[in-house]
Amino acid sequence: MTNEFLHFEKISRQTWQSLHRKTTPPLTEEELESIKSFNDQISLQDVTDIYLPLAHLIQIYKRTKEDLAFSKGIFLQRESKSQPFIIGVSGSVAVGKSTTSRLLQILLSRTFTDATVELVTTDGFLYPNQTLIEQGILNRKGFPESYDMEALLNFLDRIKNGQDVDIPVYSHEVYDIVPEEKQSVKAADFVIVEGINVFQNPQNDRLYITDFFDFSIYVDAGVDDIESWYLDRFLKMLSLAQNDPDSYYYRFTQMPIGEVEAFAHQVWTSINLTNLQNYIEPTRNRAEVILHKSKNHEIDEIYLKK
């Protein structure tokens, strides 16, 4: 990490786990297995060492936000309106954002009594493939211009104001937005927004996505490790698609494995690596917390903004 991280405090895993009293994780091994991405690795020990202290830190931020809102209400001589606590989770493709987000959803719903927690991925704000084809940018899918950022900002604004919102659903199996299908996002105590682009600036740079976040997390790892995880995930998707002709990955099951590996590597190099280096990683220092993962997926270092 370079000088851009001078305003972060680096904390070892050993020190981090000591910042929260030891308690039993509020979920079972089976529940943890069911929420992790199928090529990710996480244990109940990780929950105890990393995520319970993180949930406690979020609790501190939430309490601070509520105190500030109350004080503002007194200053403005009006009752403060309840708003959801919005958490942004970013990082590269295949780094483990989804596992982190789903785990936080469970922990927050069980740490805060009767709390409602909604989880949204920004994949739903990708333009449909047909739109990308018409604009000549299908090969730029995942890059900033392939997202309907205006719709994402509008969603965040409505959620921030306690409204229920219906948003599009994206399927990784068909590699496209699912027509006529919507995710109904209800007004909640917490809303977790996960995606590679959640710290990026929209083309209208007068309004920043991060302005809507009360807390933000970047899941980080070495580039070589992420590439290995991506290629592993790609090949595992083939095994799931063998008997599903509707899957985007089905066509690859008909190809020699060498050609498939070469294709996946080319996609990583030309799209995912380029996107990471040019658009995703440069936003890393906008997070409140950076979780750094080692080669075996274990979080070994935590960076907390000073």
Curated annotation (Swiss-Prot):
InterPro entries: P-loop_NTPase, PanK, PRK/URK
Keyword Kinase: yes
Keyword Kinase: yes
Gene3D superfamilies reported for this sequence: P-loop containing nucleotide triphosphate hydrolases
Enzyme class: transferase
Pathway(s) this gene product operates in, as recorded in its UniProt entry: Cofactor biosynthesis; coenzyme A biosynthesis; CoA from (R)-pantothenate: step 1/5
Pfam families: PRK
Protein name, as recorded: Pantothenate kinase
Gene expressing this chain: coaA
